[in-house]
Amino acid sequence: MLSPRRTKFRKQQRGRMKGLASRGNTINFGDFGLQATEPCWITSRQIEAARRAITRYVRRGGKIWIRIFPDKPITMRPAETRMGSGKGSPEFWVAVVKPGRIMFEIAGVSEEIAREAMRLAAQKLPIKTKFVGREEEYN
C-alpha cells in the first residue's frame, strides 16, 4: 500500500474539494488514461486494488503510471469513545482527487485492451470516471 515515508505533521484537517483539478489533468506519460469526473478521497487500498486490476488484465504488455499519491492522513477515534480528549490517531491515507484529475495512465497496449483495463480499475474506485486518450481531455 502507498503511504508517505515521513511527514512534517502527523495529522491534517479534512479540508474541502472545491472546483476542478488545475494540475494533473493532462496525459503526460502514457497514451490512455482514467480521469475522475467527481471529487473524492481515494484510499491507498483502492489505488492498490485498481492497480492490480489493470496489471492482471494487461499481463506482460504495457506500462502503467499511477498519477495520484495518498499523502493525507485520515484520523479515527476508537469505537464507543466519549467526545473530547483530542483528535484520533491516523488510521489510513487518502489521495484528494478533484474532477478532471488523471489517476492512471497506460501505454504500450491497444485502445481496446486499455479501455477494458481502465473499466476494471474504475470498478474498484468509489467515483465516476472517464476513459481518455492523449488528444481529448476534460478541462
From Swiss-Prot:
CDD domains, sorted: Ribosomal_L16_L10e
GO cellular component entries: cytosolic large ribosomal subunit
UniProt keyword annotation of tRNA-binding present: yes
Example GO molecular function: tRNA binding
GO biological process per UniProt: translation
Keyword terms of this UniProt record: Ribonucleoprotein, Ribosomal protein, RNA-binding, rRNA-binding, tRNA-binding
Record InterPro entries: Ribosomal_uL16, Ribosomal_uL16_bact-type, Ribosomal_uL16_CS, Ribosomal_uL16_dom, Ribosomal_uL16_sf
Keyword tRNA-binding belongs to the record: yes
Stored Gene3D superfamilies: Ribosomal protein L10e/L16
Top-rank lineage group of the source organism: Bacteria
Any single Pfam family the record assigns to this protein: Ribosomal_L16
Task of the protein: Binds 23S rRNA and is also seen to make contacts with the A and possibly P site tRNAs.
Known partners and oligomeric status: Part of the 50S ribosomal subunit.
Protein family: Belongs to the universal ribosomal protein uL16 family.
PANTHER family in UniProt: 50S/60S RIBOSOMAL PROTEIN L16, LARGE RIBOSOMAL SUBUNIT PROTEIN UL16M
Protein name: Large ribosomal subunit protein uL16
Organism: Gloeothece citriformis (strain PCC 7424)
Underlying gene: rplP
